[in-house]
Each structure stands twice: as C-alpha cells, then as structure tokens.
Amino acid sequence: MRCSVSSVVRPLSVDPATAIATLCSKGNLREAFQRFRLNIFTNTSLFTPFIQSCTTRQSLPSGKQLHCLLVVSGFSSDKFICNHLMSMYSKLGDFPSAVAVYGRMRKKNYMSSNILINGYVRAGDLVNARKVFDEMPDRKLTTWNAMIAGLIQFEFNEEGLSLFREMHGLGFSPDEYTLGSVFSGSAGLRSVSIGQQIHGYTIKYGLELDLVVNSSLAHMYMRNGKLQDGEIVIRSMPVRNLVAWNTLIMGNAQNGCPETVLYLYKMMKISGCRPNKITFVTVLSSCSDLAIRGQGQQIHAEAIKIGASSVVAVVSSLISMYSKCGCLGDAAKAFSEREDEDEVMWSSMISAYGFHGQGDEAIELFNTMAEQTNMEINEVAFLNLLYACSHSGLKDKGLELFDMMVEKYGFKPGLKHYTCVVDLLGRAGCLDQAEAIIRSMPIKTDIVIWKTLLSACNIHKNAEMAQRVFKEILQIDPNDSACYVLLANVHASAKRWRDVSEVRKSMRDKNVKKEAGISWFEHKGEVHQFKMGDRSQSKSKEIYSYLKELTLEMKLKGYKPDTASVLHDMDEEEKESDLVQHSEKLAVAFALMILPEGAPIRIIKNLRVCSDCHVAFKYISVIKNREITLRDGSRFHHFINGKCSCGDYW
C-alpha cells in the first residue's frame, strides 16, 4: 500500500527562541549555540537565554563577548536586551559596564531604572540610586520597594520610612516586600510604636498570614525587646519556614536567652527544617555565651554535614565559640582550615589570642595579615590588638600600635580604642596617664571607660583616685553595682572599714543590688552551676567536705588565704570560711570529684575572679596535677603546674 505525501506526519516547527532557551536551561550550550548561529539576525530574543546563562554560570568574559556580538548584530540598543545586559553586568560585579549600557539606551523603561537602582544599592551608592529614582517619570511598586529596601539596608531607616509614607500618600498599596522592609526600618529605629502602626497595614491589605511579612514583624518586636509579642506572631503563622525559625532563634539570642536558642534549634531540626549559615552563626554564638563546648562541637559537625562549615561567617563563629570555651587550639585549627580570606575571620582569630592573653601571637598574626595578604586593615583589627596588648602586659607595644593606627592608617580612634588604652595604662600602673587620656580625649566618655580606670585603681590600691573616678561614674549611672563593689574593694584592701560600710549603706539606700557571682562547667552534656555559698546541690555536703580537705593540702604547700579581699570586718577564721564558699571554688571541687583522673577542667564565671581564688587555682593545679581553664568576666586563665597564663597580669 502506497502512502501519499499528504499522509506523512511532519514534525511540528519549534520557535528558535524557545528551543534555544530550553537547551540553555538544560546546559546543552553547544547545541544551543548552533541553533543560535542559524538564526542570529532574525530575533533579538535569541540572545536572552545566553545572557542569562552567562549570569548563572558567573562568566563575565563570555558575557562581554556576547555583548560585542550584539553590537555587531545591530541589536545593542534594544531596551529589552539592554535590560538583560545591565542585569548581567550588575550581578557579575561589573557595575560600571551596566551604567554605560544604561547611558547609551535610546529608550528606557521602568525596568531599566529598577536594575540601575538595585545595582547602585548593591554597590552602596545610595546617592546615585536616589538620583535615578527621583528622575524617573513613571514609578512602579517594585521601584519604590527597591529604593526603600536600599535605604533601610544601609540603616537610613528614617529616610526609608519617610519614602514609604510618600509612596502610600500617592496611592500605592504596599506588598509583602514593602512591609518586610519597613518593619526592618522600625526595628532599626527601635520604635515599637511605628512598627505597631505598620502592623495595621498587614491586616488592611490582607497580608497577615504572609510568611515574609510575619517574619519581619516578629523581628521588629523582638529587636525592640518585645520577645513575647514576636513569639506570638511566629506561632500564629500557618507554616513555619526557615526564615521564621531563624527570626525566632535570632530574637532570643538578641534578648539574652541562649538556652532558649539551643532549645529552638533542636525543635527546628525535629520539625524537618534544615538550618542554614544564619542559623549556625546564631546557635554557635549561644554556645559561646554559655561556654558549652560539647554542644558547640556537635553543631560544628552538623555544619560540616550540610556543607556550611566553610562559610566565612560560620568559620568566624567557630573561632569565637572554641575560643570562648577555652579551646584556643581548636579555634586556631578552624582558622587554619579556612577556604576563603576575610577580614572578620582574621580579626576573630586576633581577638581569640587576645582573650587568652597571647599578645605576641596576636601581633604576629596581625603583621601577617598586613604584609602577606591583600585584605584591608580596619579599626576592628586594631581594637582586638589593643585588647590583646592590655591583657598581656605589652604596654609599650600597645601604645605603638595605637599611634600606628592614627598616623599610618589614618583611623580616628573610637571610644573603645581609648578604653583599651586606658586599660593598657591602668594595668601597668600608669594611673595618672590613664586618667589624663580620659579627660583630654575629643569624644564623650561613657561608664565603661571610667569603670576600666576604677578597676585599675582597685588593682593598684589607689583609694584617692578611686573615689574621684567613682564620682564621675555616679553622674552617668548611679545604679551600677559593679562600681560600688570595686570601690568597696579598694577601701577593704586598705582596711578602711568605715568607708566600706558607707559604700554598702549607699547601695542599700539606693536599692542597688550586687550581681551574684555564678560559676559553671559542662560534663557529659549537663551544665553544673554554682553560686556563692551554694548548698542547693544534691552533693553539697560532699563538696564542702572535699574543699575543706583540699584547703588543708593547699596550706601545707604554702597557700595563705587572701582575706584582704573579703568586704566585711570580721575575724580571720570567718573570712577564710567566706572565701571557701566562692562559686568558682565550689565548681572546681565538684569538677575534681566527678571528672576522670587527669581530665582538664574548664570553668566559666560571670564576674572577675578574685585574687584569692586566682592563687588557690594555682595550688590546685599542682596538687591535683590538672590543667584548669577559668574564663572570668574579662579573660581566660590557664593554670598549669602552679602558673597562670596571665602572668598575674589581670
């Protein structure tokens, strides 16, 4: 049987642009380009898939070659093609070329301006972004969103909210992206009232169930200290996605609830939501705050498993976490295994060395950063260096670095830099010079810098200056309990009990409560916490009995309790009994009781360790042949064989 020509089924003709786009999306670029060559002069839309492919593959050279081909083909002035080119150049980091394309366009539309505004915002050039915005004859909602988001991203919150009000006044209805930005703006301004006003728009425009809007709304409440209100918003969401979980976790971190952060992280994983780099940065920070190394290591392993451990922000958080848990070696290992270079990462490692009193290592790392890398040295690096010098007794080197920061690098010292210099001089006993710097510096003082000097007065027993500094502090904050305690310590050291009584009476009259000293350590995933005179532990009787025997052993080795640090006028026996009850001693005693023989001990204390406990830990490290790491309110102390890493310079 013969078939007629008309009965043969012909293949359907496929539009070249569609065929090329399909091939590009599948990665078949060679076949796509062959199709492209056959139809190169027929349709401008044929170029679009290739431009998008260059953007996706991060191939700027190929994109530029394609741009040249467009010029030769006579399509380089087509506004749609130009928009794609601008987008490509902007996303691939060649923004000047995007601006050049925009400048040569004969006809522009709102998309052209939107791309340019977004590019300027990405480059941090808000002046030119606003110029393009103001010159636009016709603005769409996306244009307003881009400009508002840009202003708020760079913390021009008032300007961003003002632009939102202008937009709304012109009759534009906000969408989820608009409201997400303005909630961030009100969070940045720490204005609950503005945020609550904007909250009304979510209901008015039917966006009360939108995930983006609710996450931003919750962030606004939490950033303003309204943690419960933020949690209510998150719980009302029909679905809790990654952004919502991160908002909840970050909100608790910002409000000083690290234990809740770790609980929420656990619940997030149980829900099946996979963490990202933002999650890891936040939960590692909470591990740092609590100094719980075991959980930090577990989270590190989870970050490795999903490929987030090499992300710069995560590496910096790992360095900080291990450092604050007393594991400087692990922090250095995380730093050495980095895959990318970043100023924040280097500054984190310099800070870690400083926190552990290893000033020489911090300076060496800074010199390597300055001489062997292309990274910019910033004020933060110098701040960490000055801190390292102040905690290592490197007075002259610290002052030299301060001068270098100003004269060689041209940085204007901030209040924190001056505070480090005051600490540097104060610890070295140069109290008059430290006070002179505070009184002559060109910026306004705060309570921290005066407390730093008061602490130095305590170290060097300068009661006259301490009284003078205390008066300055009272003008700033008359309710800071630490300052009263420091002044009382100075008087107690000089056995000026009447002055001590006056300080204590002043605290009672003003209802100033002394912050309780708390010490803790982690063992097998459990945190054991102690406070001064704590008898709430199930083994309190055994702990005090163990401490009594340990104190006798220490005395046989030459230990003499530093009763001068007791702020009460009582007999020596009572003072010694008082010293035994310090939280860090209770913690180290229980750690010695339950940890395996020879295992290192890591203890955290929320306040500065007292001089007696510092001496006692030296003796304990010898008697029990243990390495003891103590993190107090200002630094780390590593006790090995009767010596402390701080060199008694603390």
From Swiss-Prot:
Kindly give the InterPro entries that the UniProt entry links to this protein: DYW_dom, E_motif, Pentatricopeptide_rpt, PPR_At4g14850-like_plant, TPR-like_helical_dom_sf
Where, in residue numbers, are the PPR repeats? 43-77, 78-112, 114-139, 140-174, 175-209, 210-240, 241-275, 276-310, 311-341, 342-372, 378-413, 414-444
Q: Where is this region: Type E(+) motif?
A: 525-555
Specify where the region named Type E motif lies, as residue ranges.
Answer: 449-524
**Region named Type DYW motif:** 556-650
GO molecular function terms attached to this record: RNA binding; zinc ion binding
Which GO terms of type biological process are on file? RNA modification
Q: Which family does it belong to?
A: Belongs to the PPR family. PCMP-H subfamily.
Q: What name appears for this protein in its UniProt entry?
A: Pentatricopeptide repeat-containing protein At2g41080
Q: Which gene encodes it?
A: PCMP-H29
